Amino acid sequence: MREKRSGTAFLFLVAGIELAAAAPASAQAWLPPKGEASFSLGGQNLNARYHLLWDGRRDDRGKMEWYHAISDLTYGVTDRFAVRVGIPYVFSRYAGNFPHRPVGRPVHDDGQWHSTFQDFRIEARYMAATGSLVATPFLSIVLPSSGYEFLSHVAAGRHLREYAGGVSLGRRLDPVLPDTYAQAQLSFTMAQRVLGIWHNKNNADVEVGHFLSPSVAVRMLGAWQWTHGGFRIPLDAPAGSANFQVHDQLAKDSHFILGGGVSYAVNGSLDLSATVFKVMTARNSNEVRGISVGTTWGFSPAQMIRRRKGAAPTASPDAP
C-alpha cells in the first residue's frame, strides 16, 4: 500500500525540528510487512534569527543555523509489530554577540562550526487495528549518545532521557477524496527531571497527503507541542542565574509548526522526498524555518542474505 512509506517527509521534518524546537516524533500508522525493512537517510538545513520568549515576543540574539544528517531504520518483526532505531548527526553554528557561557565547560557559541551525534531513538509499534482506520500504539525511548553541549543557542539537543507513549492513526479518505489519506499521532512524553523539576509534554501531529499519480504525492504537515512545567524564558532563568545554566533543557517550549512536501516513488522500493517548514507560533522556543530532502529504501534482509548465499528466494504462500 502506498501509504506505508508516506510518512518519510514527516519523519525528517520532526526529527530535525526536535533538535531546535523540540518537536514530536513522526506519525507513521502503517508498518512494513513481516521481514521487510526500510532505511531512511535525509539531509536538512534549519535556521533561526529570533528567540520567542514566554509571551511570544521576538528577541534577536544572532543567527542560528543547523545542518542534520538523519538516519532511521524500521523493521517489520511481524505484519503488525515493528521496531525502529535512529540517530541524527548535527552540524551547527551561532553567529552573534550574546554567546551562552557554560560554567566549567568550553563556550560552544564561538562562531565556529561544531558537530556531534545527537540522541538515539528506539521505538516499538504495534498495529492494533487494520480496517478502514489503522491504529498503531507505540512506545519509545530517547537516550543521549554522547556528552554533547546543551547550553548553547545551537545545541544539538537537550541531552535528556525521554520516555514516550502514544498512538498513530491512519485512514484513506476514499471515496470522499480519492487517492487521499490522513495520518495523526497523539503522544505524551516524560522527560528526565532537571533540578527536580518536571517538564513533560504532549504532542499532536497531523499529515494529509494526496497522490497526484501512482508515483507522486503531495502533503501538508502540522505539529503541535504543549510542555507542562519548566521555565518561562527569561522570567524563570535570567542571564547570570543558576537556572540559566539549564534553561535550554527546562524551557517550557510550546509551539505550532506548519510544513508542506512532495515525494516521488522511483520504484517499488525507493522513495525521494522534499519538505519545507516553519514555526508559526511558539513560546520559549526559536523561530525556526528549514528545508529537508530525504530518501527511503525498502528491502527484505532475508532475501538479501539468501542472494548472498546463492539460494533461491522462498516462494510466497500465495504463489501459484
Model feature map: region roles:
Residues 43-49, 58, 87-93, 128, ...:
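Transmembrane beta-strands of outer-membrane beta-barrel pores
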Residues 78-80, 90, 129-133, 173-178, ...:
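Outer-membrane beta-barrel channels and translocator barrels
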Residues 92-200, 242-253, 320:
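Outer-membrane pore/translocation modules
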Residues 50-52, 98, 105-109, 198, ...:
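Outer membrane beta-barrel transmembrane domains
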Residues 21-63, 300-320:
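Outer-membrane beta-barrel biogenesis signature
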Residues 36, 66-72, 117-121, 160-164, ...:
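Transmembrane beta-barrel architecture of outer-membrane proteins
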Residues 41-43, 71-75, 85, 122-126, ...:
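Residues on the lipid-exposed face of transmembrane beta-strands in outer-membrane beta-barrel proteins
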Residues 38-42, 82-84, 134-138, 179-185, ...:
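Residue-level detector of the transmembrane beta-barrel scaffold of outer-membrane proteins
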